[in-house]
């Protein structure tokens, strides 16, 4: 009788662990989010220092999966993205650049402009009171032969850019 009871308790515990696992689509989303940050960092390896700093700022974005609804080969994940408020900071940067250099930066001021940009974004990275925005996104995913694919990536990228997505047309 004790053996049967132990077996039932053990079986129940295993079922609870399996049932409490994350859905495959959520795991795929988490992988894609990490890939986005690593691809962004790789893309910036040969770029100027200002662009590298911007990539570091974007990489500070985090997410929380609030809800997952799987319906066959389609899934909707309700996700909250917490990202640096780039919309605000880029507007401040553009205003500072325009004030200091005008609308067009002359060739002889290019090096000074690059240093200004690097300093601005470095200071932003080091700011302990940096402002974040939280954006709720409904991420649509579809299962294909290659696995789960995000079908509305622009919404996710826009949220990850912290309000700066509209500045680049997203």
Predicted region positions:
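C-terminal motif of bacterial Sec signal peptides marking the signal peptidase cleavage site
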Residues: 16-19
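Bacterial signal peptide processing site
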Residues: 21-24
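Beta-strand elements of well-folded, non-transmembrane domains
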Residues: 81-87, 143-145
